[in-house]
Amino acid sequence: MTRCIVLGRFQPFHLGHARLVEAAVNHADGDEVVVAIGSAQAGWEANNPWTAEERQAMVEAWANSTGNNVTVVLIDDINDPPNWVEHAATTHGDGRLVTSDGPTAELYRAAGWEVHDVALSERETLEGWRVRQSVRMLSTVMDDEAARTVLAASVPEAVIEWLIQNDAMFRCSTFESGVHAG
């Protein structure tokens, strides 16, 4: 049994994230899986449309729908990579990082952590900025079935339902800044 940590912004929680968390659940083999939501102070902006609490609700909606038991924690970003791991670990605690992000893996390894690398899944489709642009495109389409159909390729059903039920897509139509890939 290995306590596992999955770290991300989850803007929004998409199918790539779901596969990563599922890999952590399998790797943990019954131990705790912590989903650590970074940039917790961010929200209501083009590259971070949803607040930490909203992202937590998305993760929990997905986890409840799949029967995956996870603990969600929120971590403010300090924009200081050399000190990030120590800062984040005070919130997410000890364990093994499960990630598909090379730079994050390097930071954690340099700090002495064990890291379980997971291959990226459908990166061309499942990049956060691409998913956010799909949500933005749908944000003024007042047709829930159209939103479900389009987002199903990249977002778990429970998260789509959360976005619809909480009217959490429309805000994306109001952001002025351009696309940020990353």
Spans of model-derived segments:
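Nucleotidyltransferase catalytic core that binds NTPs
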Residues: 1-182
